[in-house]
Curated annotation (Swiss-Prot):
This is Homeobox protein Hox-C10. Transmembrane segments: none annotated. The gene is HOXC10. Belongs to the Abd-B homeobox family. Gene3D superfamilies: Homeodomain-like.
């Protein structure tokens, strides 16, 4: 080994800030420097990468101080080729050869520690080192994070920044977002149409009376004029088609539901009134005398009030069920009134 050109023995005295003169450690954690008095020559230009040493008494051997880690050991790429095995190679010692540099070569401040972005921040440490290495060595020895090395020696310095620098990186997401826009417009278009169109069928139902309502109005007018004629008409319709009244009632219920049942808020089905007041009074009188009718008595009543035998029979059945229900409710009411629930 030969000493570098024109280096005074105590050129690194400013960097050693510890009180003892034999202190061999710089302020930075990753630098180890040996004093020039140990090797009978000036301070060596090569400074090796080594982990920070905590003890002051444990001094390194001259061979360790004179050697540096190889230039191809740098940080392993996180975005490198997945086929490359992530392994940590053992550092191999290599002596630093002395070389002369032309005056045109620009020399930097720090030998092998930080990248260009980090070197810009370390301006105050420029006066601590007299003859640093050129930029070619800086790129090879760059180790931003300790204990991570690159697997292959062919890669150059990590000059690329991890930030995205260009609009090409974002073209695919923007295209995907643009493809979603027509779908949202397609979904919004039927909603606008639904707000404008309203059904107008209830108006036609409410304005134009149904033929069933016309029939009922005519029958009521006839009942006012001559009750006997209305009874005859009802008897004829009941004899001819007993199911027509059911169909008419269902149609009336549908008409009420369409015309705005939400205004009246009626609950339950519409009650049918197939019997007139005169007919119901006659049937109630007979029910008071006898709850169960014989076939002969039933035929007599049906002839007097212009009803069929079947209609009278059904009316008495319904009346008995109604009476039974009323008796049950009255009985429950009487039982509950005797007990005082507190």
């Amino acid at each position: 080994m030969t000493c570098p050109r024109n280096v005074t023995p105590n050129s690194y005295s400013e960097x050693l800030a510890a009180p003892g003169g034999e202190e061999r450690y710089s302020r930075s954690a990753g630098m180890y420097m040996x004093x020039g008095s140990d090797f009978x020559c000036g301070v060596m230009r090569g400074c090796g990468l080594a982990p920070s040493l905590s003890k002051r008494x444990x001094g390194g051997s001259p061979s360790l101080a004179l050697n540096t880690y190889p230039s191809y050991l740098s940080q392993l790429d996180s975005w490198g080729d997945p086929k490359a095995a992530y392994r940590l190679e053992q550092p191999v010692g290599r002596p630093l050869s002395s070389c002369s540099y032309p005056p045109s070569v620009k020399e930097e401040n720090v030998c092998c520690m930080y990248s260009a972005e980090k070197r810009a921040k370390s301006g105050p440490e420029a006066a601590l080192y007299s003859h640093p290495l050129p930029e070619s060595c800086l790129g090879e020895h760059e180790v931003p994070v300790p204990s991570y090395y690159r697997a292959s020696p062919n890669y150059s310095a990590l000059d690329k920044t991890p930030h995205c620098s260009g609009a090409n990186d974002f073209e695919a997401p923007f295209e995907q977002r643009a493809s979603l826009n027509p779908r949202t417009e397609h979904l919004e278009s039927p909603q606008l149409g639904g707000k404008v169109s309203f059904p107008e069928t209830p108006k036609s139902d409410s304005q134009t009376p149904s033929p069933n309502e016309i029939k009922t109005e005519q029958s009521l007018a006839g009942a006012k004029g001559s009750p006997s004629e209305s009874e005859k008409e009802r008897a004829k319709t009941a004899d001819s088609s007993p199911d027509t009244s059911d169909n008419e009632a269902k149609e009336e219920i549908k008409a009420e539901n369409t015309t705005g049942n939400w205004l009246t808020a009626k609950s339950g089905r519409k009650k049918r009134c197939p019997y007139t007041k005169h007919q119901t009074l006659e049937l109630e009188k007979e029910f008071l005398f006898n709850m169960y009718l014989t076939r002969e008595r039933r035929l007599e009543i049906s002839k007097t009030i212009n009803l069929t035998d079947r209609q009278v029979k059904i009316w008495f059945q319904n009346r008995r069920m109604k009476l039974k229900k009323m008796n049950r409710e009255n009985r429950i009411r009487e039982l509950t009134s005797n007990f005082n629930f507190t």
